[in-house]
């Protein structure tokens, strides 16, 4: 077999296979080039999901006429010279334009601010035409037609036009969040599908841009983040635990303003919410990590979607600590989406006559009450009507026996001071599980079991971690065989593991002996536990799996040791529970991620009854 030197066009096509997977990748590369050029206005036009036509226009610095040929040549760039460790631009490899030109019909038109005329160059399947003079405003216009016409087999892997357009839209949104000062627009050949006006390049402008993309419900359900460790700064927004989604599509992470989809960051964010969100739910979050370029490697993935941090443990600690601190500081603040869902459940237009009795002991003498209530009033009611109605209604109410709807009311009128509490004063308990509380301007519904479960769980954790956890000695120490590297890495966490009741020691190269395990875990599969911890230590330089297992046991204990549904509470007990909820962190959700209380504003109640 003869070794041959591949042609430049074949090399570009191979590179395109890595960099250009779908039309959204083309848009990403071209938009990033526009941002690097200092553009403040970027317009994207597509047709057929970008498969037949893509046009990206910007008002950036433009490309000098004598450098257009270099711009479409492989590994020609103005963004780096001889240092690949300090990268300050989104693009730096010089692969995008030649890769696109090798698999599509590419037209590049550019003009600098100083030039009188624009210049264009055309590349079709690697063949170059031009450059030649053209007419255009200062900036750059890139047109891409018939993507993958050179490699039609790739078109078979494309999704529908709608799916590809949605992927392009999602890509633009992810980039636009990091650059609020840039105006973005996305349109088809006949209509504009997305318009993002420029905002101030500040925290407020950032939130305004995020609201444009995420919707109005994001701001009231988010918490601002601002933390720093050493030379690394974390800013952005984290959501309330009860404001979550069923997938990770609403998690946005940026490293030096570069959008990334990094599994390490996703796992870290979910880990920060582990105690307050259900396992099958994902937080809505937008994180910006700014650090020296030398501390992160962005050149580890063809599309630069993944990154590698020099100190991942520091990054993990910063993110988890910042989110925990933010959640601790919010106090009593339910997600507005819970209240909106509650409001939408009300059926205010349902006629009274459509309600059916669930009780079978109604006597026939009371049936006329329902029909009278549902029929129109033909004459005004006088005082006698009201008296008669009340006399008939009393025995009717006495005959209703509905245990599931038992109501225990507080006989005392709440003071103005009690109404000033975040969760107000308890007014009643319904269905032997829900506490109804009143504040100055709202009504609060509390799930007593879920709320007390969180209180017990937090108290258990405080008691557990205030001192080293008790351990149980193994009758026969167990030896676990690992690779020498994994064993060495895990032993560096020996002291931390000892605090959780796990005693390990070296037992020669590539082996660890386990002499004691946490008492809380009871019988444990030592082999599986040590191997899982070794994998985690090798990949993330942490051993959080053990803490997660202990937390899981504590959560189970809290669930079984809390106030059960069906228990009647006195007014004093209900108010004491409300005050404990206010004083304890993370009480917005139970251990399983469900809301513990819901707030319904007085203004919303008045709207339900048509008062506002």
Swiss-Prot record:
SUPFAM superfamilies for the chain: ATPase domain of HSP90 chaperone/DNA topoisomerase II/histidine kinase, DNA mismatch repair protein MutL, Ribosomal protein S5 domain 2-like
Coiled-coil annotated spans: none
GO molecular function: ATP binding; ATP hydrolysis activity; ATP-dependent DNA damage sensor activity; mismatched DNA binding
Claim: Membrane is one of the keywords in the record: no
Gene3D superfamilies to which the protein is assigned, alphabetical: 3.30.230.10, Histidine kinase-like ATPase, C-terminal domain, MutL, C-terminal domain, dimerisation subdomain, MutL, C-terminal domain, regulatory subdomain
CC per GO annotation: mismatch repair complex
Keywords: DNA damage, DNA repair
GO terms classed as biological process: mismatch repair
Domain of life: Bacteria
SMART domains assigned to the protein according to its UniProt record, in alphabetical order: DNA_mis_repair, MutL_C
HAMAP family given in the database record: DNA_mis_repair
NCBIfam families: mutl (TIGR00585), PRK00095.2-4 (NF000953)
UniProt function note: This protein is involved in the repair of mismatches in DNA. It is required for dam-dependent methyl-directed DNA mismatch repair. May act as a 'molecular matchmaker', a protein that promotes the formation of a stable complex between two or more DNA-binding proteins in an ATP-dependent manner without itself being part of a final effector complex.
Family per record: Belongs to the DNA mismatch repair MutL/HexB family.
Name this polypeptide is given: DNA mismatch repair protein MutL
């Amino acid at each position: 077999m003869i070794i041959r030197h591949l042609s430049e066009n074949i090399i570009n096509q191979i590179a395109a296979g890595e960099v250009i997977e779908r039309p959204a990748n083309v848009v990403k590369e071209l938009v990033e080039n526009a941002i690097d050029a200092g553009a403040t206005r970027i317009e994207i036009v597509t047709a057929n999901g970008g498969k037949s036509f893509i046009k990206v226009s910007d008002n950036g610095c433009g490309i000098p006429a004598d450098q257009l040929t270099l711009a479409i040549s492989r590994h020609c760039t103005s963004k780096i010279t001889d240092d690949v460790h300090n990268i300050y631009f989104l693009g730096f490899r010089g692969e995008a334009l030649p890769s696109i030109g090798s698999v599509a019909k590419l037209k590049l038109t550019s003009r600098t601010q100083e030039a009188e005329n624009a210049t264009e160059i055309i590349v079709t399947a690697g063949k170059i035409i031009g450059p030649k003079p053209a007419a255009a405003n200062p900036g750059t216009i890139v047109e891409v037609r018939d993507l993958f016409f050179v490699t039609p087999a790739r078109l078979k892997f494309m999704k529908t036009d709608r799916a590809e357009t949605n992927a392009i839209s999602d890509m633009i949104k992810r980039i636009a969040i990091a650059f609020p000062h840039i105006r973005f627009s996305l349109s088809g050949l006949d209509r504009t599908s997305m318009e993002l006006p420029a905002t101030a390049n500040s925290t407020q402008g950032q939130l305004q841009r995020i609201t444009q993309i995420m919707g109005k419900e994001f701001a009231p359900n988010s918490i601002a983040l601002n933390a720093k460790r050493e030379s690394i700064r974390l800013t952005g927004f984290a959501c309330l635990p009860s404001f979550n989604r069923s997938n990770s599509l609403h998690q946005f992470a940026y490293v030096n303003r570069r959008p990334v989809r990094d599994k390490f960051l996703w796992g870290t964010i979910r880990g920060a919410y582990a105690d307050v969100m259900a396992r099958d739910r994902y937080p809505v979050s937008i994180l910006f990590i700014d650090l020296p370029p030398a501390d992160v490697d962005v050149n580890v993935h063809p599309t630069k979607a993944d990154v590698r941090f020099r100190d991942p443990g520091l990054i993990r600690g910063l993110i988890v600590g910042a989110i925990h601190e933010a959640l601790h500081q919010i106090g009593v603040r339910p997600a507005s989406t819970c209240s909106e869902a509650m409001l939408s459940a009300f059926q205010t237009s349902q006629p009274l006559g459509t309600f059916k009795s669930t009780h079978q002991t109604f006597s026939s003498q009371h049936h006329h009450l329902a029909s009278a209530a549902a029929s129109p009033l033909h004459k005004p009611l006088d005082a006698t009507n009201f008296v008669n109605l009340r006399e008939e209604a009393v025995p009717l109410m006495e005959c209703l026996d509905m245990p599931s709807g038992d109501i225990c009311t507080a006989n005392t009128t709440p003071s103005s001071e009690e109404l000033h509490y975040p969760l107000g004063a308890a007014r009643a308990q319904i269905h032997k599980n829900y506490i109804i509380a009143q504040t100055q301007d709202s009504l609060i519904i509390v799930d007593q079991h879920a709320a007390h479960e969180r209180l017990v769980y937090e108290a258990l954790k405080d008691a557990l971690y205030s001192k080293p956890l008790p351990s149980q000695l193994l009758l026969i120490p167990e030896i676990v065989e690992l690779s020498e590297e994994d064993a060495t890495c895990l032993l560096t966490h020996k002291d931390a593991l000892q605090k959780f009741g796990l005693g390990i020691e070296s037992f020669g190269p590539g082996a660890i002996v386990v002499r004691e395990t946490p008492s809380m875990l009871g019988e444990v599969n030592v082999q599986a536990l040590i191997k899982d911890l070794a994998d985690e230590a090798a990949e993330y330089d942490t051993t959080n799996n053990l803490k997660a297992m202990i937390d899981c046991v504590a959560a189970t204990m809290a669930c079984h040791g809390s106030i059960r549904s069906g228990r009647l509470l006195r007014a004093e007990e209900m108010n004491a529970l409300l005050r404990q909820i206010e004083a304890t962190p993370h009480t917005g959700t139970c251990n399983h991620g469900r809301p513990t209380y819901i707030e319904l504003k007085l203004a919303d109640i008045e709207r339900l009854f048509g008062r506002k």
